[in-house]
A protein has these predicted regions:
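Extracytoplasmic mature domains of secreted/periplasmic and thylakoid-lumen proteins
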Residues: 121-129, 135, 139, 147-153
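Surface-exposed interaction patches
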Residues: 98, 107-110, 135-146
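Short, functionally critical alpha-helical segments immediately adjacent to catalytic or ligand/cofactor-binding
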Residues: 37-54, 99, 135-137
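Extracellular cell-wall/glycan-interacting regions and their flexible linkers
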Residues: 1-41, 147-195
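N-terminal secretion targeting segments of exported proteins
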Residues: 112-122, 145, 153, 158-160
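Peptidoglycan-targeting cell-wall enzymes and recognition modules
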Residues: 2-18, 23, 48-128
Length: 195
């Protein structure tokens, strides 16, 4: 597997932050709780596959093969028509805002959600990135053949999780406890007086 840090981008940072800091939750009127890092990595890993963009730099993509899906979540059918009317563009914030509002029913004429009835974003496994990825694949993204892309989505999610775990990992206790040399100590080391 390639160095995960090479796929990190501003768009990915924004998506992870919005999902984990409660911003996305607020957009759903708290219907969906703030995501754990594993849940956020699972959603981003799935979106990477859906968009074909390994760093989420292109989120407003139109599916080439069947021409049906569009956007970060590759909305199809009625969900695609609502997406086209909302026109969130390529901005990751607007893409996630659209997803939140669509989930809570804003774009459904009957006031019901086009996907929220599944409760798929409310029931994602919290601490297992593979289980979370599979849950979202089956219940939220729902491709025609989930097995065709399952492993790629899982690998994407694991890469994303690794990136953000590395960024949030606390420094080792040894590194924290090691005293930092002051200017006098540094000068004494030069003359061989201090170690």
């Amino acid at each position: 597997m390639a160095d995960p840090m090479k796929i990190r981008s501003q768009q990915m940072d924004t998506a992870i932050r919005m999902l984990t800091d409660g911003t996305f939750s607020k957009m759903t009127n708290r219907k969906v709780p703030a995501f754990s890092l594993e849940q956020a990595a699972a959603l981003v890993g799935n979106a990477m596959h859906e968009t074909g963009s390994p760093n989420l730099s292109k989120t407003d993509v139109v599916e080439i093969d069947s021409g049906a899906g569009r956007g970060m979540m590759q909305y199809t059918g009625e969900r695609r028509a609502a997406y086209d009317r909302a026109n969130p563009g390529n901005d990751i914030r607007r893409q996630l805002e659209y997803a939140a509002k669509e989930y809570t029913g804003k774009y459904d004429p009957g006031g019901r959600s086009l996907v929220g009835y599944t409760r798929s974003l409310e029931t994602i496994p919290r601490r297992d990135v593979v289980a979370a990825t599979n849950h979202l694949l089956k219940n939220y993204f729902r491709p025609a053949d989930p097995n065709a892309s399952r492993q790629e989505r899982i690998n994407n999610a694991k890469q994303v999780l690794k990136i953000y775990q590395q960024l949030t990992k606390p420094k080792s206790k040894v590194a924290q406890d090691k005293p930092k040399p002051n200017a006098l100590t540094s000068i004494l080391k030069i003359f061989g007086v201090a170690k």
